[in-house]
């Protein structure tokens, strides 16, 4: 694999613009090579022209012209000249190579003069238009070579400037990310140590109770625990490390000592209690996405554990960023040496070794610190288990048996499906479900439809993962996957092939046995299919990708609790998938009713109640998405989410209107036609609304000012026709509801085939929609250079909100009392400075000074001083006496202790020992 493809495959996609522009350097080196070749060709052509011109005289007078060294003729003397167009000799490209320039008196010389080159074949001097003739040693005589030399120097400077720009870019980005990751680690470390201190004897209690028990140890800092009113989102551009200072790169040992001092056992200032106090003090500045008001200690511990694992993955990615850039620079210098046949790679790599992103050893220190803290805190000192959990596994390559089983199961499934279609066409009234042969065929059809549509979506999702992994789309960030336990497209396709084989086997056995055997035995196989699928989804054992299954269950649990939890991308992304599977809920209700009632009574109760329950169940997925939009509007206060709410409201209205139009509630044909017309109008409006949202919001296309016609500026897929094709097909598949109008004359049971067709079309449309939705989200993250999603949980408040409000009221009352007391003291001090008649004390020298002026030894000439309420004039001498007297009284009242000077000591010279004086 070439390094360019290797770099594109291994790089963090969100940091793509921050890597070395390897292709640009390759192009620059190729241009240098091309310039060198053209320069050699120019020298060869010049010598050939010289030979031809000296061999063939132009006229007889040329032989009579003496050489330049022997000629004494003036510049105005007539000379024989030949004019040749410039484009036949002058090069057209700029180069960075050097050329030797030497010319003899008998050689032919060229010069650039207003798009023409004049060649003097005899005299050696060149005469150009609008210029005086110059001697052979003139710089114009060597003009073409010097022009090439200047072009070579310019290209070399361009290469050097590109190199310096890349150094600056890589160093700046590396330093920024390094500071951010170190800041995150310090925050996590403080909270881990604080939690270890708090949770020693309270592992089974809530964090609120544990903190209330440990509040005597925390002292006055207990009120600094989590408070939602002071939470701020940290600005990543201003992140600084509190444990590691930017003192250059040299001195990894000093960094190690600095981190050794920050460990709990290194100094008294870093003891567990001190770390707890620091964690509490910095809790308000941590980045959080949820309110952990009811979290248990164990959940907080797991959150910190995941945060530390994510921080470790960030550091590993930044280290790989360094190594890839080093390899890129080495490849560039080697290619430069190969093309120019030089030996500059050694000096170039020395220059690379001096860069900050190579010399910095802070990440190594942090990496060891994380490993040690994680091992001792979460793995009880077992380093092997800790490293197995911290390290991200390498890229998964499916073993041959997995690929073989996937292909084998897919092939057998296809064969079984063909046999099923053959049996149903020959023996089953597949178009008219009212036929009694085979028994309960309609119920089994709906059962297999309920399972088959999600299996089809699973196949589509595996293909989606295959394409996105090849395009290096960061699904770990977008969907919130764990990089250590995630499944790849190999696993998804293998699971889909296995489920497809079970599905076709169940359908084949039921169809074959139902034709040849009477009774309920054939229904056993569809029932076993349901049992196997439920076991695979909810299996509690650590088999069949349990972390991924639990992640999916957790995601759908968040979807169903939409109004009560903040909405993440994975929530509304899989909520959209769920809207395409709305028919599955209706089939699920029918299947449950069948196994509970109709299977044993041979009745059709389920079919009679299905038209009334079906619209309610079909409206559940869009209702959940509408509630998610309301929650996002509540959190963000953006009106765009209310527009999304309107889209799903129209979808629900269209579903309800369609159910009413097709139900038996309307006996009058005119009312039924009117309801049908209303449904068509609502469906058209809903389709246009949804298409506009798909193109403008979800895909980000239809930009009128884009450089790509009706698309957007940045496209992730290479071929533009893919976007236009997707826009057309998405429009057509959005209108799949019109099929129901075309087959309105069919019976309600026969329409179940139409429902199957529309469901397959909708799932296919969603499959296509997913590509461009994930692309748009990925480009948004790339624009923000966001590659990781690290969430640090905050510590809870020890008091309820009512107690907090009471505390705030008490603090406000205390502040008001202190202000009133200060005002009274100021009035007392002002009255003391007034005479018996209420006039200010006046001396010979009037000067306005303040306490600061007195301390600094400065004063202002006559004026006034505003002491909040008292405004007066005073004598400087009397003021000095008052201050000295006040200082003496303060010393006596405080047992000769040194008391700092304050303005209150001046105002309260008779009350210096009072409790309210601010000494």
From Swiss-Prot:
PROSITE patterns: EXS, SPX. Residues 605-806 form the EXS domain. Residues 62-137, 242-272, 891-919 are annotated as: Disordered. The record marks 22, 26 as: Important for inositol polyphosphate binding. InterPro entries: EXS_C, SPX_dom. It is a multi-pass membrane protein. One of its GO terms (cellular component) is plasma membrane. Belongs to the SYG1 (TC 2.A.94) family. This is SPX and EXS domain-containing protein 3. The lineage of its organism: Eukaryota, Amoebozoa, Evosea, Eumycetozoa, Dictyostelia. The gene is xpr1.
């Amino acid at each position: 694999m070439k390094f360019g493809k290797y770099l594109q495959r291994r790089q963090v996609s969100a940091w793509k613009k921050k890597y070395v522009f390897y292709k640009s350097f390759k192009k620059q080196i190729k241009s240098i090579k091309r310039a060198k070749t053209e320069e050699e060709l120019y020298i060869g052509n010049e010598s050939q022209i010289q030979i031809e011109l000296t061999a063939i005289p132009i006229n007889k007078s040329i032989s009579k012209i003496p050489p330049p060294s022997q000629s004494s003729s003036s510049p105005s003397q007539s000379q024989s000249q030949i004019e040749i167009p410039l484009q036949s000799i002058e090069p057209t490209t700029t180069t960075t190579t050097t050329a030797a320039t030497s010319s003899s008196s008998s050689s032919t010389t060229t010069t650039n003069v207003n798009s023409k080159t004049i060649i003097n074949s005899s005299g050696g001097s060149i005469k150009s238009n609008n210029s005086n003739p110059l001697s052979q040693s003139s710089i114009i005589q060597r003009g073409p070579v010097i022009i090439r030399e200047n072009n070579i120097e310019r290209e070399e400077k361009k290469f050097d400037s590109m190199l310096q720009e890349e150094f600056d870019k890589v160093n700046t980005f590396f330093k920024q990310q390094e500071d951010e990751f170190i800041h995150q680690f310090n925050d996590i470390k403080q909270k881990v140590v604080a939690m270890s201190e708090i949770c020693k004897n309270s592992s089974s209690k809530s964090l609120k109770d544990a903190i209330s028990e440990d509040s005597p140890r925390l002292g006055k800092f207990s009120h600094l625990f989590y408070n939602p009113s002071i939470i701020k989102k940290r600005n990543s551009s201003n992140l600084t490390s509190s444990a590691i200072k930017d003192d250059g790169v040299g001195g990894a040992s000093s960094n190690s000592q600095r981190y050794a001092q920050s460990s709990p056992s290194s100094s008294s200032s870093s003891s567990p209690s001190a770390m707890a106090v620091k964690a509490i003090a910095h809790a308000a500045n941590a980045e959080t996405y949820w309110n952990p008001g009811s979290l248990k200690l164990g959940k907080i511990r797991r959150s910190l554990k995941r945060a530390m694992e994510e921080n470790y993955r960030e550091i590993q990615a930044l280290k790989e960023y360094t190594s890839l850039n080093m390899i890129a620079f080495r490849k560039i210098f080697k290619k430069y040496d190969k093309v120019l046949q030089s030996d500059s790679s050694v000096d170039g790599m020395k220059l690379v070794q001096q860069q900050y992103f190579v010399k910095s050893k802070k990440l190594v220190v942090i990496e060891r610190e994380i490993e040690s803290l994680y091992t001792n805190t979460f793995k009880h000192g077992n380093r092997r288990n800790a490293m197995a959990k911290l390290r991200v596994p390498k890229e998964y390559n499916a073993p041959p048996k997995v690929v073989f089983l996937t292909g084998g199961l897919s092939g057998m499934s296809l064969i079984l499906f063909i046999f099923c279609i053959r049996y149903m066409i020959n023996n089953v009234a597949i178009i008219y479900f009212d036929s009694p042969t085979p028994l309960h065929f309609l119920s089994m059809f709906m059962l297999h439809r309920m399972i088959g549509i999600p299996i089809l979506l699973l196949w589509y999702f595996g293909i989606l993962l295959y394409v996105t992994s090849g395009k290096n789309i960061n699904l770990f960030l977008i969907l919130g996957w764990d990089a250590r336990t995630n499944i790849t497209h190999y696993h998804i396709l293998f699971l889909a092939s296995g489920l497809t084989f079970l599905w076709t086997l169940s359908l084949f056995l039921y169809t074959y046995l139902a034709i040849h055997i009477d009774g309920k035995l054939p229904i056993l196989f569809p029932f076993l299919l349901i049992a196997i699928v439920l076991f695979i989804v909810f299996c509690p054992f650590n088999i069949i990708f349990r972390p991924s299954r639990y992640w999916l269950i957790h995601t759908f649990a968040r979807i169903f609790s939409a109004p009560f939890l903040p909405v993440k991308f994975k929530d509304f992304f899989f909520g959209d998938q769920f809207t395409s599977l709305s028919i599955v809920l209706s089939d699920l209700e029918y299947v449950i009713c069948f196994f509970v009632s109709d299977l044993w009574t041979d009745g059709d109760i389920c079919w009679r109640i299905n038209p009334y329950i079906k619209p309610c169940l079909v409206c559940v997925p869009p209702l959940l998405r509408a509630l998610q939009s309301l929650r996002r509007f509540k959190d963000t206060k953006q009106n765009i989410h209310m527009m999304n709410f309107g889209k799903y409201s129209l979808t629900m209205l269209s579903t309800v209107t369609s159910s009413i139009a097709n139900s038996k509630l309307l006996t009058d044909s005119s009312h039924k036609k009117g309801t049908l017309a209303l449904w068509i109008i609502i469906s058209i409006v809903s389709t246009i609304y949804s298409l506009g949202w798909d193109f403008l919001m979800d895909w980000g296309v239809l930009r009128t000012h884009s450089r790509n016609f009706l698309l957007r500026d940045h496209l992730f897929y290479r071929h533009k026709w893919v976007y236009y094709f997707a826009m057309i097909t998405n429009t057509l598949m959005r209108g799949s509801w019109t099929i129901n109008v075309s087959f309105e004359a069919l019976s309600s049971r026969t329409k179940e085939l139409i429902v199957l067709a529309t469901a397959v079309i909708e799932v296919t449309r969603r499959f296509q929609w997913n590509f461009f939705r994930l692309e748009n989200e990925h480009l948004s993250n790339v624009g923000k250079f966001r590659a990781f999603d690290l969430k640090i949980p905050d510590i809870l408040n020890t008091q309820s909100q009512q107690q907090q409000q009471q505390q705030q009221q008490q603090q406000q009352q205390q502040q008001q009392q202190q202000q009133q007391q200060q005002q009274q003291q100021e009035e007392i001090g002002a009255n003391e400075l007034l005479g018996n008649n209420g006039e200010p004390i006046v001396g010979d020298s009037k000067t306005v000074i303040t306490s600061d002026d007195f301390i600094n030894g400065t004063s202002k000439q006559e004026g006034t001083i505003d002491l909040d309420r008292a405004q007066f004039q005073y004598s400087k001498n009397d003021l000095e006496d008052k201050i000295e007297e006040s200082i003496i009284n303060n010393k006596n009242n405080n047992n000769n202790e040194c008391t700092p000077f304050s303005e209150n000591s001046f105002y309260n010279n008779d009350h210096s020992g009072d409790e309210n004086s601010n000494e």
